[in-house]
């Protein structure tokens, strides 16, 4: 019996009928705290990694090797005043930052950390994740409109156009996963990648979806970078022409909430990519399966997050028209064609996804 099973059994005996509610709240709080810590140190890792790419040290003053820098940043933002523009719509202006964070946290309800370790093991988990993660753009639009600033509103309009352009391609990439796994349940999708010719010979990583669905994997991940408004797709903020886009009139913790949502969404995109295409908690080789599955999931997510940062440090920012062209004229045709190819592949004698 695992530690969580022991706690669950002991709590049920102690609190009786109230325990399921208490246990659900405890699990939600634990996941939320872990995500917040991951965001804090993801920002530090980003600054460190980009510093090394620039041949400099990065943050190294607060605490040993700069490890307390995230805490100093949080304290600074907590102490800053939230200054509201006089022409802004008060309540919408204040609600918008909260609306960006809530969907980012809500997606974690269906992401499995390892077998049987998920907050809500729902059968439509993939559909839920895609629907919830798409809501955040409405908060960006709301922030741009409520600020009553032409720069903020222009950034919000860019966010809407960018979301529409890349959401369709992401949707088709996820349709391919649904076709091959035959389920919308994220745990079952991971399970569908744990069998096949290569998995039977102990080489698990060659049975994961990244290999047969490589175009969809690339489209999904690059579209995820665009959906999170990360460099080189950060025209929503557009420092060179619209200063900071929808965030230009925000300060203090209201400003910090937008960045919190951005980094949580980075982790969400990486976690979903690892779950859908990289085997989730599955070990790359059978002889390593004794290591807890959550370790492999964290390792894959960390690697994908490092790619996020590497892309930021490497590529110049695209023009707005180039971003639209990539979404509509490259990614959308590629995913549609690959849906057709995989459909015929599954109906042929060469079908590798036979259950």
From Swiss-Prot:
One GO process term, biological-process aspect: aerobic respiration
Spans traversing the lipid bilayer: 25-45, 91-111, 126-146, 170-190, 205-225, 253-273, 290-310, 330-350
Catalysed transformations (reactions): a quinone + NADH + 5 H(+)(in) = a quinol + NAD(+) + 4 H(+)(out)
Keyword Ribosomal protein attributed: no
Enzyme category, top tier: translocase
GO molecular function: NADH dehydrogenase activity; oxidoreductase activity, acting on NAD(P)H, quinone or similar compound as acceptor; quinone binding
EC numbers, comma separated: 7.1.1.-
InterPro entries the record matches: NADH_UbQ_OxRdtase_su1/FPO, NADH_UbQ_OxRdtase_su1_CS
Protein's membrane topology: Multi-pass membrane protein
One Gene Ontology cellular component: plasma membrane
UniProt subcellular location: Cell inner membrane
Keywords carried by this UniProt record: Cell inner membrane, Cell membrane, Membrane, NAD, Quinone, Translocase, Transmembrane, Transmembrane helix, Ubiquinone
Family: Belongs to the complex I subunit 1 family.
NCBIfam families: PRK06076.1-2, PRK06076.1-3
Oligomeric form and interacting partners: NDH-1 is composed of 14 different subunits. Subunits NuoA, H, J, K, L, M, N constitute the membrane sector of the complex.
HAMAP family, alphabetized: NDH1_NuoH
Function: NDH-1 shuttles electrons from NADH, via FMN and iron-sulfur (Fe-S) centers, to quinones in the respiratory chain. The immediate electron acceptor for the enzyme in this species is believed to be ubiquinone. Couples the redox reaction to proton translocation (for every two electrons transferred, four hydrogen ions are translocated across the cytoplasmic membrane), and thus conserves the redox energy in a proton gradient. This subunit may bind ubiquinone.
Protein name in UniProt: NADH-quinone oxidoreductase subunit H
Species the sequence originates in: Burkholderia ambifaria (strain MC40-6)
């Amino acid at each position: 019996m695992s530690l969580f099973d022991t706690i669950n059994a002991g709590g049920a005996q102690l609190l009786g009928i109230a325990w399921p509610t208490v246990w659900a709240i405890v699990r939600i709080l634990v996941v939320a705290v872990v995500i917040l810590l991951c965001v804090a140190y993801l920002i530090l890792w980003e600054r460190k990694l980009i510093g090394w790419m620039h041949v400099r040290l990065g943050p190294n003053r607060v605490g040993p090797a700069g490890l307390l820098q995230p805490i100093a940043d949080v304290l600074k933002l907590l102490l800053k005043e939230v200054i509201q523009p006089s022409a802004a719509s008060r309540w919408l202006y204040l609600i918008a930052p909260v609306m960006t964070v809530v969907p980012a946290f809500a997606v974690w309800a269906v992401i499995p950390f390892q077998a049987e370790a998920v907050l809500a093991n729902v059968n439509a988990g993939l559909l839920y994740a895609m629907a919830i993660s798409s809501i955040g753009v409405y908060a960006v639009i709301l922030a741009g409109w409520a600020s009553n600033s032409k720069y903020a509103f222009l950034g919000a309009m860019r966010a809407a156009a960018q979301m529409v352009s890349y959401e369709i391609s992401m949707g088709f990439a996820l349709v391919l996963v649904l076709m091959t796994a035959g389920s919308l349940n994220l745990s079952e999708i991971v399970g569908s990648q744990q069998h096949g010719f290569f998995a039977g010979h102990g080489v698990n990583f060659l049975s994961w979806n990244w290999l047969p669905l490589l175009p969809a994997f690339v489209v999904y991940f690059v579209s995820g970078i665009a959906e999170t408004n990360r460099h080189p797709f950060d025209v929503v903020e557009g420092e060179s022409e619209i200063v900071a886009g929808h965030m230009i009139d925000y300060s203090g913790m209201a400003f910090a909430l937008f960045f919190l949502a951005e980094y949580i969404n980075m982790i969400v995109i990486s976690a979903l990519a690892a779950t859908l295409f990289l085997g989730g908690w599955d070990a790359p080789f059978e002889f390593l399966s004794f290591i807890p599955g959550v370790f492999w999931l964290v390792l894959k997510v960390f690697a994908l997050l490092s790619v996020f940062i590497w892309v930021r440090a490497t590529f110049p920012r695209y023009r707005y028209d180039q971003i639209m062209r990539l979404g509509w004229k490259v990614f959308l045709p590629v995913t549609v064609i690959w849906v057709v190819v995989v459909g015929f592949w599954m109906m042929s004698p060469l079908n590798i996804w036979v259950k």
